Amino acid sequence: MKRTKSIRHASFRKNWSARHLTPVALAVATVFMLAGCEKSDETVSLYQNADDCSAANPGKSAECTTAYNNALKEAERTAPKYATREDCVAEFGEGQCQQAPAQAGMAPENQAQAQQSSGSFWMPLMAGYMMGRLMGGGAGFAQQPLFSSKNPASPAYGKYTDATGKNYGAAQPGRTMTVPKTAMAPKPATTTTVTRGGFGESVAKQSTLQRSATGTSSRSMGG
């Protein structure tokens, strides 16, 4: 009889442990899953220039200026390049294009047009930039240049888009939004020129991909 009681007590302790530890294990797993989701997204703010950033972040004017200047450099490296001023203006509007030095590796689709532009290419002015929210204690931050089409017929019209054509909504500075961390990653340098209307086509393709990805994610979460 003593042996039977001992076995029953051991069984009770085993079952009790299983019932009470399982919810804890699930809770821990949930925490790790949530942490994974948090790491994949980043909260960013959209500014037109360093002054906008400084006004929104008092005492951080130096950081705002650094981020703005870095975004300008990134824009020069990654912005869509056009062989002629006319092609650039057709997408981004009069007064919104500037001449950019020819970059190593550039391969204009029309070499004659490139020569007409005196060996230089044309690129849109940076319309704004996306910046990782400033953190206390001098934490690091990232920035990404944004462009905006002035052509009503373009899919990019009135939108903030990055160099790859990804759309981040209306071209209105001062907004805060959540984006994938990949959105803040450096973009590849431009190595070819864009034909007239080509950037708008890139934006349309990216929008289709974004909608498709969102739909797939929703279906997965819904089971």
UniProtKB/Swiss-Prot annotation:
Domain of life of the source: Bacteria
Residue numbers spanned by region Disordered: 178-223
Q: Which stretches does UniProt call biased (Low complexity)?
A: 178-195
Q: Where is the composition biased (Polar residues)?
A: 204-223
Checking HAMAP family in the record gives: UPF0441 (MF_01188)
What NCBIfam families does the record tag this protein with? PRK11653.1 (NF008655)
The family note in this entry says: Belongs to the UPF0441 family.
Protein name, UniProt field: UPF0441 protein YgiB
